[in-house]
Amino acid sequence: MATRLFTSESVTEGHPDKIADQISDSILDAMIKDDPKSRVAVETLITTGQVHVAGEVTTKTYVDIASVVRERILEIGYDSSKKGFDGASCGVSVSIGAQSPDIAQGVDTAHETRVEGSADDEFDRQGAGDQGLMFGFACDETPELMPLPIALAHRLARRLSAVRKEGQIGYLRPDGKTQVTIEYVDGKPARLDTVVVSSQHAADIDLDTLLAPDIAEYVVEPELALLEIATEGRRLLVNPTGRFEIGGPMGDAGLTGRKIIVDTYGGYARHGGGAFSGKDPSKVDRSAAYAMRWVAKNVVAAGLASRCEVQVAYAIGKAQPVGLFVETFGTGTVPDIQIQDAVTSVFDLRPAAIIRDLDLLRPVYAQTAAYGHFGRPELDFTWESTARAEALQRAVKG
């Protein structure tokens, strides 16, 4: 019997890096709402009393970026200097230029059209916005087909934020983190080993007599009651530093794209390195990573494997992927190459086809920017659909 421990973490919407992600995606949404063909690459830096927005944008619409920034920060809960940041009074600087024409030409007119003369198929006309490799993953550990450690970490982080906003624990502040360690036996989750919850709080809050009991009662225990694995003997660590009064952008500077493992699978699967937030779907860092989750989830939903990881790779300016790789870690019901061939026949992985099939030219991105882009049953994300599972089953049978 092989016993191992695996750990994943999540952060709340008030974590400085997540504030930056949400600002970048809120700006993206505002542009796509009025001009779905907007090309957007927006980065955000947030620090004590200041927000800096920079990047490259080509759009037909106008967005009051400073207003978008302030509204998002206030929605998160930073509305007073007593909390370390005030969205109403912070400084906002904006430095936005146009998308490079050298990049635009490869996206607007793909290699297949410019060089290979393939102009008949409209999906051959749009090239990938960059080179790169993207991974998607799914497994049968949870109903949403996500690894249990990251799924539980996200649930705890969402509940930590909810009890603050609903006033159940009114002295909490927006910044917070969760971490979950699961004991695996023979590759299957068997027992909850450790939960760590760190939350920013008001001054003069006693950790032992108030904060720790409240976190246990209102945040941790309701989620553990839903678990289908053993929880006896677990450890709960609340604010292990002893105090967390200074948080958010006052405690640490935040940057777009610094929580890519939280955004995906909690380290349980590989990552191509590209961040998501602030990028329109012509950037395959985002759209192809969503597509790979879609593919992997359908493979598992089809019963072809209990774990599936899919890699795709692109060359900038080229529509067709330059590589596809399927790995089921020995859990496949048929050979991996057979699943790979089925994926190729069922899914069109050219960027324009992904954008069409997943309906990505919509303002849906700000809601992805906290608590994970995948395995969100409370949200109706197109890349979480398993409607192609039956088509994969048929394709495998030939």
Curated annotation (Swiss-Prot):
GO terms for biological process: one-carbon metabolic process; S-adenosylmethionine biosynthetic process. Disulfide bonds: none annotated. The gene is metK2. The keyword Transferase applies. Residues 99-109 are annotated as: Flexible loop. Pathway: Amino-acid biosynthesis; S-adenosyl-L-methionine biosynthesis; S-adenosyl-L-methionine from L-methionine: step 1/1. Homotetramer; dimer of dimers. NCBIfam families: metK (TIGR01034). Signal peptide: none annotated. L-methionine binds at residues 56, 99, 252, 283. ATP binds at residues 15, 175-177, 243-244, 252, 258-259, 275, 279. This is S-adenosylmethionine synthase 2. One of its GO terms (molecular function) is magnesium ion binding. Belongs to the AdoMet synthase family. SUPFAM superfamilies: S-adenosylmethionine synthetase (SSF55973). K(+) binds at residue 43. Binds 2 divalent ions per subunit. Coiled coil: none annotated. It comes from the Bacteria. Mg(2+) binds at residue 17. The keyword Iron does not apply. Its main location: cytoplasm. Its cofactor is Mg(2+); K(+). Its EC number is 2.5.1.6. One of its GO terms (cellular component) is cytoplasm. It comes from Frankia casuarinae (strain DSM 45818 / CECT 9043 / HFP020203 / CcI3).
